[in-house]
Regions:
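Interfacial aromatic-anchored transmembrane helix boundaries in multi-pass membrane proteins
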Residues: 21-38, 63-99
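Internal alpha-helical transmembrane segments of multi-pass membrane proteins
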Residues: 105-132, 186-195
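Membrane-interfacial segments
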Residues: 26-30, 34, 72, 76, ...
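Mid-bilayer segments of alpha-helical transmembrane spans in multi-pass integral membrane proteins
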Residues: 92, 96, 100, 124-136
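Hydrophobic transmembrane alpha-helices
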Residues: 1-57
Length: 195
């Protein structure tokens, strides 16, 4: 039991460092072209982390992404994301929703052969939910302003398309990599015949 907890804590630490580094690189590559920058690598990573393990761990990927986004907002001045209800909460909810979408689709299909396709479909739906949750949180918890309007337009117009495409392609790959590195036998149980 202690070994499992130690493994989980170490895994979360490594993934947090990786997530923050990737998010920072994405931000500084695009900061001169578009604000807020698209998280085209970070979002597939957070979705893959949300599909790691069982439902109790499904909040990990989104929470790590939200915390990294919250910290980075102070570094680069994304004032809209200074509020944790905008930067952390929607990402945590999207991670949990992504797990349950993947779980539900896997239970419906019950076939190993289509798992990669289901993972890609789940990733696409999770990006859609993530965008809706973040924009909804911005609408409810933000004070508005010119930067708010720009952020709203950029997220819908540019970021969503890039993040959606990358999540569909990269999430199944990242899930396989995480599964192999952590020696997890499978992310979700397949539906057994006779159950």
């Amino acid at each position: 039991m202690k070994k499992d907890k130690a493994h989980l804590i170490a895994f979360i630490g490594v993934m947090t460092a990786l997530m923050f580094t990737v998010l920072m690189l994405e931000t500084y590559v695009f900061i001169f072209f578009i604000k807020p920058s698209p998280a085209f690598l970070t979002i597939p990573l957070f979705i893959a982390l949300s599909m790691y393990g069982d439902w109790k761990h499904s909040f990990i990927g989104g929470t790590i992404f939200g915390c990294c986004s919250f910290i980075l907002s102070f570094i680069v001045g994304y004032t809209v994301f200074y509020n944790p209800l905008i930067s952390i909460l929607p990402r945590t909810l999207a991670g949990v929703a992504g797990y349950w979408i993947f779980y539900g689709l896997t239970m419906l299909a019950g076939k190993e052969k289509v798992r990669q396709v289901l993972c890609a479909v789940s990733a696409g739906l999770t990006v859609l939910l993530h965008t809706v949750f973040v924009l909804g949180a911005m609408q409810v918890f933000s004070t508005g302003g010119a930067f708010f309007d720009t952020v709203w337009q950029v997220i819908i117009g540019v970021n969503f398309v890039a993040e959606f495409a990358c999540a569909i392609v990269l999430t199944p790959i990242l899930v396989k990599v995480i599964k192999k590195v952590t020696k997890t036998p499978d992310f979700l149980p397949l539906k057994k015949k006779g159950n």
